[in-house]
Amino acid sequence: MAEGSALLRGSSNHKVTLVTGNDGKRREVQACLEGHVLVENVNLDLPEMQSDSVFEISRNKALMAYDITKSPVLVEDTALCFDALGGLPGPYVKWFFERIGPTGLIKLLEGFDTRRAYATCVFTYCASPDVVLQFEGRCDGRIVEAPRGEGGFGWDSVFEPDEGCGQTFAEMQDEEKNRISPRAKALVALKAHFCL
């Protein structure tokens, strides 16, 4: 068993520091891990490496966060990948969204035959520089023709998951989204690894 596994398995008071400044992410993580892990939150202004790999980005941020906190951390990175664009915007979706918004994301697919896309989320748990574990969740779906829904955050109004019964993430109740989102799936993998 890895040292990081022992840190969560060996105590009835599991605790990890989630590194995010995004309140929506924090709420989703706390809802998914409620009753299993005490999630503390810290907002660290970490430089984000430029890479097309959410695994590399998440790992890099986790190691930096651990170096600052000197305690177990959980860091997440997400990508929204359009089939027609060879996987773009991918992990750059945050910057695309900030500059062009949901309608701009949709317009990126004008003239293409497919609106297929997938969302992926990677959580990196870092208990020390030598104990770095990663957990991925993926959700296939499509980009809708116009933003729909008022809930969620970020690009939730443009992504309709295959498992979503025709709704975008922004149209779903939190409980439904937290059951099928890539973030939820990655957290399920994390909980399974630690037998939580």
Swiss-Prot record:
Entry keyword annotation includes Cytoplasm: yes
Enzyme Commission number(s) of this protein: 3.6.1.66
Subcellular location field: Cytoplasm
The reaction(s) this protein catalyses: ITP + H2O = IMP + diphosphate + H(+); dITP + H2O = dIMP + diphosphate + H(+); XTP + H2O = XMP + diphosphate + H(+)
Cofactor: Mg(2+); Mn(2+)
Chief place of localization: cytoplasm
Keywords recorded for this protein, A-Z: Cytoplasm, Hydrolase, Magnesium, Manganese, Metal-binding, Nucleotide metabolism, Nucleotide-binding
Record-level Gene Ontology MF annotations: dITP diphosphatase activity; ITP diphosphatase activity; metal ion binding; nucleotide binding; XTP diphosphatase activity
Binding site for Mg(2+): 48
Top enzyme class: hydrolase
Gene Ontology terms describing biological process: deoxyribonucleoside triphosphate catabolic process; nucleotide metabolic process
Intrachain S-S bonds: none
One GO term describing the cellular component: cytoplasm
One Pfam family from the record: Ham1p_like
Record function comment: Pyrophosphatase that hydrolyzes non-canonical purine nucleotides such as inosine triphosphate (ITP), deoxyinosine triphosphate (dITP) or xanthosine 5'-triphosphate (XTP) to their respective monophosphate derivatives. The enzyme does not distinguish between the deoxy- and ribose forms. Probably excludes non-canonical purines from RNA and DNA precursor pools, thus preventing their incorporation into RNA and DNA and avoiding chromosomal lesions.
UniProt-listed NCBIfam families: RdgB/HAM1 family non-canonical purine NTP pyrophosphatase
UniProt protein name: Inosine triphosphate pyrophosphatase 1
Organism of derivation: Trypanosoma cruzi (strain CL Brener)
Source lineage: Eukaryota, Discoba, Euglenozoa, Kinetoplastea, Metakinetoplastina
